[in-house]
């Protein structure tokens, strides 16, 4: 079938809006009509060429919501007309990782997903006879996309897709990092580095967890008002201080914060986030994705004196079994999604969404088909 799509043909070049061919879903696969998709920093990261797994030409997009229009052989968990969110972190329930109960990092489709193809090793997308790569198992920048059954969360059909599409990545990652990875407790102190979609979601999650002090850090003060609406108690611009930001936070709090979160993907900021953690028990969670070949560093003394350094993917959330509940929470107003959507636009304007992101003028732009 034909589908409108925004295709990244080359590194660093604007996406091209073209009509691609989408092959039918094969065994264990589902054809989904995407209704809305967010434009995430991870899409921009891959487009920039810094992503070590980046492949071109590719149909990007991984933060979407849509409706099932066709199912392949053997699919039982969803049917025609179901409302779904594609998942870049699958949940098969059968692999070693799923059965461990210790992680959400299912490996059922990981090997092929990282190669930009479906589980059988081939692509469902083509343009003028040329095969196009899939992206993170989702490819929501195409109006019609094919997704593995194990990579689909079935959601309440009454949910607003313009909002809940953000649960496909950023908001879930941030809130999940607070509850699942850091396990923030009432009264704990929190520092959040980077106030994009994920950082603001961490702030919101920390407020849900009843954290005592929530310190929001960004070099763009225009983001502070929304951070305070989300629950931040303090907002800091590192440019306003001569000292390293970790020293500023340690002096503000006495010994540092109970939990810090790096939501940017900058290895120097990752170090700052660790070193502002409380001596003896502070922990720092890396959420941001750094560029290819970059490494983190700190003095071992920082860890010997009780700090913990950890990371998280999709906030530790199991997509098929837990994401539907987060959709319900959003419908009850327990998770705020509307404030994240600063711009909405048609697919033809998708490159504007990247410009707004790079200029720091948006939290999330949502594309509607």
From Swiss-Prot:
Details of cofactor binding: Binds 2 Zn(2+) ions per subunit.
Q: Per UniProt, where does Zn(2+) 2 bind?
A: 92, 95, 98, 106
SUPFAM superfamilies (UniProt xref): GroES-like (SSF50129), NAD(P)-binding Rossmann-fold domains (SSF51735)
Q: Which cofactor does it need?
A: Zn(2+)
Q: Where in the cell is it found?
A: Cytoplasm
Keyword annotations for this protein? Cytoplasm, Metal-binding, NAD, Oxidoreductase, Zinc
Q: Does the keyword ATP-binding apply?
A: no
Purpose: Has high formaldehyde dehydrogenase activity in the presence of glutathione and catalyzes the oxidation of normal alcohols in a reaction that is not GSH-dependent. In addition, hemithiolacetals other than those formed from GSH, including omega-thiol fatty acids, also are substrates. Also acts as a S-nitroso-glutathione reductase by catalyzing the NADH-dependent reduction of S-nitrosoglutathione.
Against PANTHER family, the record matches this protein to: ALCOHOL DEHYDROGENASE, ALCOHOL DEHYDROGENASE CLASS-3
The protein, known as: S-(hydroxymethyl)glutathione dehydrogenase
Q: What is the lineage of its organism?
A: Bacteria, Bacillati, Cyanobacteriota, Cyanophyceae, Synechococcales
